[in-house]
From Swiss-Prot:
Keywords, comma-separated and alphabetical: Acetylation, Electron transport, Heme, Iron, Membrane, Metal-binding, Mitochondrion, Mitochondrion outer membrane, Phosphoprotein, Transmembrane, Transmembrane helix, Transport
Protein name per UniProt: Cytochrome b5 type B
Organism the protein comes from: Mus musculus (Mouse)
A molecular-function term among this protein's GO annotations: metal ion binding
In-chain residues carrying the UniProt-annotated modification N6-acetyllysine: K30
A Gene Ontology cellular-component term: mitochondrion
Propeptide: 1-11
Positions that bind heme: H55, H79
Protein family membership: Belongs to the cytochrome b5 family.
Main location: mitochondrion
Amino acid sequence: MATPEASGSGEKVEGSEPSVTYYRLEEVAKRNSAEETWMVIHGRVYDITRFLSEHPGGEEVLLEQAGADATESFEDVGHSPDAREMLKQYYIGDVHPSDLKPKGDDKDPSKNNSCQSSWAYWFVPIVGAILIGFLYRHFWADSKSS
C-alpha cells in the first residue's frame, strides 16, 4: 500500500507518477476566497484564481463552489468542449486517493432504493386509474338507470 509523504503544499504518493501532486480535501477547503480559489472537478484539483474575473457566468458562481467538489455543478451547466479544454491550464494536482469516495459507495438513499421507488412509481397511478374507473362506472351506471 502506498503511503503519502508530505511535500509542502501537496503530497506525493510513493509509486505514483512523479509529476502528480496530491491534495487533501482539507487543504482544498482552505482555498475558498477570491485571493486563492481552488476547486475539485472529477477528482482533479484546479487553481482557478486567475480565471475568476474571466468566467462568463461571473465570479460569484465560482466562489460558491470554491474549496469544494464542484463536479456536479460543472456538469449540470453543460460546459462546452472549449471550456473543458481551458480547464486543463488551471490543473494543479489530484485529490489524495484516501479522500476519494469509492464508486458505488453512494450513501444517498434516493439513489440506492431504485427498486423500491420503481414499484411505487407505477403502483400509485395504477391504483388511481382503477379507482377512477370504478367511480366512473358506478356514477355512469347510476345516471343511465335514472
